């Protein structure tokens, strides 16, 4: 049963990638408190990993520099709740930045080679999935 729910979660995440969709990214601030903000997923491999694009000098990047623990949540009015917990890192490799670039980012950055632009790579360690009134908990 977990495999079926995990596959459905991966399909939902795939549908929620790009500039038009959002999820909630929770990080730990400099004082040790949780913070949550909406962000678009640029790419994903099911529930295994997700990437986000943001500014290197922004608050998200600063928080990740201090603490690489994070959670991601996708939710739709009772239809599903996908919560992933894991680690997150800042990636500035030019090839990765180019691969993760999407058109919506041009409102914030001059291009994939903009030094202010970075990629955040989230890797799931554990999950809590609730889809079609079925729940799956586990670790990867």
Feature-to-residue mapping (PLM):
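A short, Trp-centered hydrophobic/proline-enriched beta-strand micro-motif
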Residues: 15-30, 70-74
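Histidine- and/or cysteine-centered catalytic micro-motif in compact active-site loops
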Residues: 28-30, 40, 55-57, 75-77, ...
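Extreme N-terminal tail/first-helix region
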Residues: 1-23
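A short mixed-secondary-structure module that forms the rim of ligand-binding clefts
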Residues: 42-79
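Short, basic and Ser/Thr-rich N-terminal targeting/leader segments
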Residues: 19-21, 34-37, 82, 113-116
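Charged, gly/pro-rich active-site loop segments
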Residues: 1-4, 83-140
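Short, surface-exposed beta-edge/turn micro-motifs
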Residues: 20-22, 48-50, 67-70, 115-117, ...
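N-terminal leader/targeting helix
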Residues: 21-48, 52
């Amino acid at each position: 049963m977990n495999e079926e729910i995990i596959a459905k979660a991966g399909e939902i995440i795939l549908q929620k990638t790009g500039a038009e969709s959002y999820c909630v990214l929770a990080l730990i601030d400099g004082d040790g408190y949780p913070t949550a903000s909406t962000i678009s997923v640029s790419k994903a491999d099911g529930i295994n990993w997700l990437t986000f694009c943001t500014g290197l000098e922004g608050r998200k990047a600063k928080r990740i520099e201090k603490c690489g623990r994070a959670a991601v949540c996708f939710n739709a009015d009772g239809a599903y709740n996908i919560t992933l917990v894991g680690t997150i890192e800042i990636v500035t490799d030019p090839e990765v930045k180019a691969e993760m670039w999407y058109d919506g980012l041009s409102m914030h950055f001059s291009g994939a080679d903009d030094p202010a632009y970075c990629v955040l790579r989230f890797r799931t360690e554990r999950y809590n999935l609730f889809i079609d009134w079925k729940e799956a908990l586990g670790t990867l």
